[in-house]
From Swiss-Prot:
Top-level taxon of origin: Eukaryota
Organism, as annotated: Arabidopsis thaliana (Mouse-ear cress)
SUPFAM superfamilies listed in its UniProt record: RNI-like (SSF52047)
Domain F-box intervals: 45-88
InterPro entries noted in UniProt: F-box_plant (IPR044997), LRR_dom_sf (IPR032675), LRR_FXL15/At3g58940/PEG3-like (IPR055411)
Protein name: Probable F-box protein At1g60180
Pfam families the UniProt entry points to: LRR_At5g56370
Length: 322
């Protein structure tokens, strides 16, 4: 596999790269390429300068999907000349493996999981779908103030997307922004997915997201995939601001929520569903998938008489995720 990849990197024309996906792993591409039939490209653990990625992209004129995973040294990812590019995926878990800025006016789908601060979205004006989250090491004692502003700036660039997926860490940061009184943008999203468990550090952010999404038709809640920032980061930040964490994490109706994700009972699930109903206007469907690992009751006990609001279809299910 390594020899094959080196051959491709050193070749200027690869006519056999037609409709299949192609992946470069742990390489340092240095020359120009001419992959005129390539539609899907994945670069993982590569050393990429701005000039290098520009050369690669210029040699892929019909590229439709680009994945960058843990690629170092990239500063500005300029995709303005990739006219047919529709899907961009970026993942990293250390600071220098993400571009600082993204210029991608033609993409329709964005999947972004970055370390700490997100990439600055300079131009994503054609975006229809976005999935975003961030990774922060659990040993941190508090949150850096700049991260709140960076996340809110990113949200402004996602305002027109019809489908949004937010991870648990993003929701916790948004909750902190909400209790600190920072302004939120309005959204045109019609389908919102929240990848989170139910606990106090996500409630204020979820409330505000729902209130600021007046066109929302479908909301889906599914368990997070781990790597959750500890609550002390947010409590310590509030302490430094002179705020009382025990008061701040209440929902707007005064409910005190569970601090831990574990031991989730039927009462809290009912309150969560009611909270989402109260904060949406034209919702058609709500899907709540609960992590069976954190439940202290069986699903059959979670059949309360939810207040019906505009005949919203409510679906409850469980999954086992550690």
């Amino acid at each position: 596999m390594e020899a094959f990849i080196i051959f491709l990197i050193s070749s200027t024309s690869i006519p056999l790269l037609s409709n299949s996906a192609f992946e470069l792993f742990n390489m340092i591409p240095r020359c120009s390429v001419s992959w005129t039939s390539l539609k899907k490209l994945s670069l993982r653990f590569c050393e990429l300068s701005d000039e290098c990625i520009a050369k690669i992209l210029s040699g892929c004129p019909i590229l439709e999907s680009l994945t960058l995973s843990h690629c170092i040294y990239l500063t500005v990812l300029d995709l303005s000349k990739s006219l047919r590019l529709r899907t961009l995926e970026i993942a990293c878990n250390i600071d220098n493996t993400r571009p600082r800025q993204i210029v991608a006016p033609h993409i329709h789908r964005l999947r972004l999981k970055t370390y700490q601060s997100p990439c600055a979205l300079v131009d994503v004006s054609s975006l229809d779908e976005a999935q975003v989250d961030c990774f922060i090491y659990s040993h941190l004692k508090t949150l850096d103030a700049y991260l709140l502003q960076d996340i809110l700036k990113m949200l402004e660039k996602l305002q027109n997307a019809e489908k949004l997926i937010f991870g648990c860490n993003i929701l916790q940061i948004l909750s902190l922004a909400e209790v600190c009184g920072l302004p939120f943008p309005m959204f045109k999203t019609k389908a919102l997915t929240l990848e989170t468990d139910i606990f106090q550090y996500v409630i204020p952010g979820i409330e505000r997201l729902l209130q600021n999404s007046p066109d929302l038709k479908t909301v889906t809640v599914r368990p997070s995939d781990g790597n959750i920032m500890p609550g002390r980061c947010f409590d310590n930040y509030l302490d430094l601001q002179g705020l009382n964490p025990n008061q701040c994490w209440r929902s707007k109706d005064g409910v005190f929520w569970n601090k831990s994700r574990s031991n989730l009972g039927s009462k809290r699930v009912t309150l969560f569903v009611e909270l989402m109903l109260k904060n949406t206007k034209i919702l058609d469907k709500m899907v709540v998938q609960l992590n069976e690992h954190y439940l202290r009751s069986k699903l059959k006990e979670f059949v309360p008489t939810f207040s019906q609001k505009n005949n919203v279809l409510i679906v409850l299910s469980t999954t086992l995720r550690l």
